[in-house]
Regions:
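Class I SAM-dependent transferase core
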Residues: 2-51, 57, 61-63, 67-68, ...
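Conserved class I S-adenosyl-L-methionine
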Residues: 54, 85-94
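Conserved SAM-binding loop of SAM-dependent methyltransferases across substrates and taxa
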Residues: 95-108
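Conserved SAM-binding motif I beta-strand of class I
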Residues: 110-115
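Conserved SAM-binding strand-loop segment of SAM-dependent methyltransferases
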Residues: 132-143
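A short glycine-rich, Lys/Arg-flanked "PGG" loop and its adjoining helix->strand segment in the class I
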Residues: 165-176
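Conserved beta-strand signature within the Rossmann-like core of class I S-adenosyl-L-methionine
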Residues: 174-186
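Active-site capping/gating segments
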Residues: 183-226
Length: 226
């Protein structure tokens, strides 16, 4: 399957699995591409416009020129470079977001999708398998007991930053890309003080700078660098 056909297949797969195991609300399943898929790809947009160094590490050089997924003119079946060997942990993946859309866009990056709730991991695993995503592994585990470490961590609003950071202590080498909404000034200040994060190590990027729909008005990508 090409990238585009995989994205097209996602809605049907999630509707099917959601009828068996409710992991997405009715409102969100009716707006799956905007509320889940495109929101997940906000991380890829951030890399494209603010962190091309990481985008290249993930093998996404061709996304710098455009990609139909983002409504640009260039369709790439595999937006990857040579020798990509990055590992990414999606912690608290739920039914597979942001991990599955990102794994679709970056097929040579190894994604580990982890959640403590077994039924959510089942949905993520079955959807990834149906899409033929060979770069996805799913794990039913709490973060604290997950073995190993990863180059990057991604996650979507599973908790406040001051609670999230202890979960991933010792589990990442380069960056955390965290999708979160609302006014984040106090939350970030609390986390920076509590964990003595260096000044300049935390950045915030509004997805609405590229995606202008009202849904993204207060949606941000938080980048925490080592």
């Amino acid at each position: 399957e090409t990238q585009l056909s995989r994205f097209e297949d996602m809605e049907g797969l999630y509707r099917e699995w959601n009828s068996k195991i409710n992991v997405v609300s009715r409102k969100d399943i009716d707006n799956l591409y905007e509320h889940h898929v495109l929101h997940s790809l906000g991380i890829a947009l951030y890399l494209k416009f603010r962190r091309p160094d990481v985008l290249r590490m993930w093998g996404g050089e061709s996304l710098l020129g455009g990609c139909e997924v983002f409504g640009d003119e260039t369709l790439t079946e595999n937006a990857v470079g040579d020798g990509v060997s990055c590992t990414v942990l999606d912690l608290g993946c739920g039914g597979g977001f942001p991990g599955i859309p990102l794994a679709t866009l970056f097929p040579e990056v190894k994604f580990t999708l982890c959640d403590s709730i077994g039924k959510k991991v089942t949905v993520a695993r079955e959807v990834a398998a149906a899409l033929g995503l060979e770069n996805v592994e799913t794990v039913n585990s709490r973060a604290e007991t997950l073995p190993g470490a990863f180059d990057y961590v991604v996650s979507r609003a599973v908790t406040s930053l001051d609670k999230f950071l202890p979960w991933v202590k010792g589990k990442w080498h380069r960056d955390i890309f965290y999708l979160k909404g609302g006014d984040l000034v106090e939350e970030i200040a609390l986390a920076m003080g509590k964990f003595r994060l260096p000044k300049g190590s935390v950045g915030v990027w509004p997805i609405s700078s590229v995606l202008h729909d009202e849904f993204f008005a207060e949606k941000m990508v938080i980048d925490i660098r080592k």
